[in-house]
């Protein structure tokens, strides 16, 4: 039953179309030393508990004979960096992917949306929500290093975008991570549509 909530979240993500063509990966902290993460190449809308494998948070070592998701290093970094994090969700939605490419700077700044309050600690729509945008890379260790350097300057909150790739977000548990994902996806779609209207 430990993975039941995460399995349900993965199926919900699949139904939303936020992880098409087996894209994305989802994980849950198992204990201080390890996490469960989706096996590579599986449809996230049809997962069950057997589709997750255990990965060591410090070393990234996985169960022999099974291949963890490509971005496993991002998940294990977040579990090391934030001991309070209990779940990480990485998705490939259209709005997150488009906005990550359209954003000219290294940070997507959102303000004026009531749904900003879906993010833990946000209490006012006038406050700015800053989501870091990183260049995509197939070199995950190098990407993790860049993310860690940026985090040392401006601590990450809620999630970050990878250009042309998608969103990675997290929470203290599956429920909070799912709430952050849904809130951010709503905000991204609003911002995308706002920019389209202003460009006309």
From Swiss-Prot:
Free-text comment on the cofactor? Binds 1 zinc ion per subunit.
Q: Family membership, please give it.
A: Belongs to the aldolase class II family. MtnB subfamily.
Q: What is its EC number?
A: 4.2.1.109
- Read off the Pfam families from this record: Aldolase_II
Name this protein carries in UniProt: Methylthioribulose-1-phosphate dehydratase
The record's Gene3D superfamilies line, in alphabetical order, gives: Class II aldolase/adducin N-terminal domain
Q: Answer whether the UniProt record assigns the keyword Zinc to this protein.
A: yes
GO molecular function annotation: methylthioribulose 1-phosphate dehydratase activity; zinc ion binding
GO-annotated biological processes: L-methionine salvage from methylthioadenosine; monosaccharide metabolic process
State the InterPro entries in the record: Aldolase_II/adducin_N (IPR001303), Aldolase_II/adducin_N_sf (IPR036409), MethylthioRu-1-P_deHdtase_MtnB (IPR017714)
Cofactor dependence is on:
Zn(2+)
Amino-acid positions noted as binding Zn(2+) in the UniProt annotation, renumbered to this chain: 90, 92
Tell me the classification of the organism that encodes this protein.
Bacteria, Pseudomonadati, Pseudomonadota, Gammaproteobacteria, Enterobacterales
* Coiled coil location: none
Q: What gene is this protein a product of?
A: mtnB
Gene Ontology CC: cytoplasm
Which pathway does UniProt place it in?
Answer: Amino-acid biosynthesis; L-methionine biosynthesis via salvage pathway; L-methionine from S-methyl-5-thio-alpha-D-ribose 1-phosphate: step 2/6
Q: List keywords of the entry alphabetically.
A: Amino-acid biosynthesis, Lyase, Metal-binding, Methionine biosynthesis, Zinc
User: Which transformation does this protein catalyse, written as a reaction?
Assistant: 5-(methylsulfanyl)-D-ribulose 1-phosphate = 5-methylsulfanyl-2,3-dioxopentyl phosphate + H2O
> Which purpose does this protein serve, as stated in its record?
Catalyzes the dehydration of methylthioribulose-1-phosphate (MTRu-1-P) into 2,3-diketo-5-methylthiopentyl-1-phosphate (DK-MTP-1-P).
């Amino acid at each position: 039953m430990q993975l039941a909530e995460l399995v349900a979240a993965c199926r919900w993500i699949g139904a939303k179309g936020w992880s098409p063509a087996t894209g994305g990966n989802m994980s849950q902290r198992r204990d201080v030393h390890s996490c469960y993460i989706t096996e590579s190449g599986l449809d996230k809308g049809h997962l069950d508990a057997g589709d997750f494998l255990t990965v060591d948070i410090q070393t990234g070592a996985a169960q022999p004979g099974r291949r963890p998701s490509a971005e496993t290093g991002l998940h294990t970094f977040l579990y090391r960096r934030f001991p309070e994090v209990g779940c990480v969700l990485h998705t490939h939605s259209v709005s997150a992917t488009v906005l990550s490419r359209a954003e000219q700077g290294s940070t997507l700044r959102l303000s004026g949306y009531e749904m900003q309050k879906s993010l833990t600690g946000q209490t006012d729509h006038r406050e700015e929500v800053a989501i870091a945008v990183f260049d995509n890379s197939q070199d995950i260790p190098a990407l993790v290093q860049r993310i860690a350097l940026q985090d040392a300057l401006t601590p990450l909150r809620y999630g970050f975008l990878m250009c042309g790739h998608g969103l990675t977000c997290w929470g203290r548990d599956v429920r909070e991570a799912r709430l952050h994902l849904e809130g951010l996806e709503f905000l991204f779609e609003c911002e995308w549509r706002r920019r389209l209207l202003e460009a006309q």
